[in-house]
Structure formats: C-alpha cells, structure tokens
Amino acid sequence: MDNDQRHTKHFATKWLVFTDLDGTLLDDRYDLRAAGEAMDTLHEHGCICVPASSKTHLEMMELNKFRKFPSPYIFENGAGLCWPSAPEPEHFGRDTDEICDLLDHIRGAHDFHYRTFRHISDVELQAITGLSASAAASAKERTGSMPLLWEDSPQALESFSEALSFIGLQVVQGGRFCAVLDKSCNKGLGMRKVAEHFMRPEAKPILVSCGDAKNDLEMLALADIAVLFPSTNGQYVPFNHPVVHYAATSGHEHWLQTMRHILGIEESFSEHSLDRTERHTYE
C-alpha cells in the first residue's frame, strides 16, 4: 500500500460518490472550477467524490487543481486509477501502443471507417469538442485506451466490436466518441478498488454512481444508488437497478442539486431499502 493510501485508510466516510464528467457533472460550458467546487461541497458534508471518466491522466490532474480536497480518480474508462499523492498512477490492461497496433491489424483485415485520435488533428479535435489547444493536447496523451470517431454504420460497429472481442479488446460508447481498450477494463474496476480501500467492518460507505452513457453502466451497477443523467438526445440509457434516480439535465448546478436531494432523502438508507425499485426525477 502506498503512502497516500496509508494516509487515507483511517478516514471513515458515509458516502462514496463516483461520477462521470462529460454529460453528467460537466455540460457544454466545461467549467472545471465549478465542477471541482461542487465535489468539494459534498466533501464538506462527509462525502468523498471520485471522478470516473474517459479523460486522460493529464486531464484529470487539471480537474484536481480546482479542488480543495483532491480525491482518487479513474481515468480512460477504467484503464487507470490515480490516488492524490501517489507518485505514479496504476495502469490496467494493454497500453495504448499495443491497442493501436491491434487496431491497425483490424483495419487491414476489414473495411471499417473510423478515425482514432492519432488521425484527428488538434485543431479538428478542438472544433469537435470545444476544448482549448492545451486541453486537446492533454486529451491525446493516452496510456491505456484509444478514442475514435466512428464514421460507419451501426451494423459495422457491431462487427467491429466482435472483431475486437476476439483479440481481447472492447469498444465502449461515450458521448461523442467511442473508445477502444482492454476487455478487462471498465469504470467499475476502478470503482471496486476505491470502494474496497474505504470499506471498514464497522463503517461501510454507501456507494452512489452518476452517469449518462453505456460506458458508465458497470459503475452504475455496482452502486447502492444509481443516478442517471440524460444523454445528448435527451433520453436515458436503458438500465435496471433497485434504486435509480433520474436527473433532469447535466452540469454542476443540477448535479449538485440532485446529489443534495439524494443525500437528504436517503439519510436513513439501509440494505433493506434495496428490496424495492425507486424512481425519482429532479427538475
């Protein structure tokens, strides 16, 4: 166990909140400072907020700069996990170079139409995402995944997914991009590691997960309370869970409002309350 984990092991928390970023805590304004402040607000009420994103280690480090209480974070859809004071992040699965080599092999054997971040210029990436030049550069610094812009049919995407599965890779769909990573990796992997770290026999925290897309499903499934945010088309990703809350829209204000409602409503939360399905929508 590293120094940072030893330092935090004694800290008991009632709530562990795992949250996706784009389309959940962040909206099109991409206000990292406000997102950090929203997570800090919950921390002041006894919650540890753990961001879990397709973003890179460098991008997540930038978010932590705006937090008074930096937390662990899960990056690249679960291909990595970083503790606040750890000298190096943990990496899981194949690295990006190996993934790209395998993608080149797939491209040579099939006629799939897509472009990875290695084929998209920084300028085009800025235009697609609205990121600054420095943020776009950070988004390309991948260690365990490769995002791509799918330019083929949904049927071709299914065939692509099958071809990847055969060689131990997977494609996950986020908001704007798909991402290819090792089949063993997902946000739930990082969530499980963080949750185990904070679990104590006398004080087991309640797990809350927030997300809006298919790449959040494993993380949502592990939670005691799942919070769904609408995708860009206004629809909620299909998902079954004993306790589901539906947020009206994304962005730090709505995220914080929803979380405040949940923390108040579920103050007396216990295991027996999971015996029924609950649906709550917050406007």
Task: Describe the function of each predicted region.
Residues 28-119:
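Active-site phosphate-binding/coordination module
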Residues 70-76, 134-135, 226-231:
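Short hydrophobic/aromatic-enriched beta-strand-loop microsegments
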Residues 13-29, 220:
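Asp-based phosphoryl-transfer active-site loop
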Residues 106-208, 214-215:
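Conserved acidic, metal-coordinating active-site core of Asp-based
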Residues 27-45, 158, 185-197:
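Short, acidic loop-to-helix structural element flanking the phosphoryl-transfer center
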Residues 14-17, 71, 207:
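The start of beta-strands in P-loop NTPase/AAA+ ATPase cores
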Residues 7-12, 32, 178-283:
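Mg2+-dependent phosphoryl-transfer enzymes with acidic/Ser/Thr/Gly-rich catalytic loops
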Residues 67-69, 76-77, 167, 222-224, ...:
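Short, structured coil segments at secondary-structure junctions
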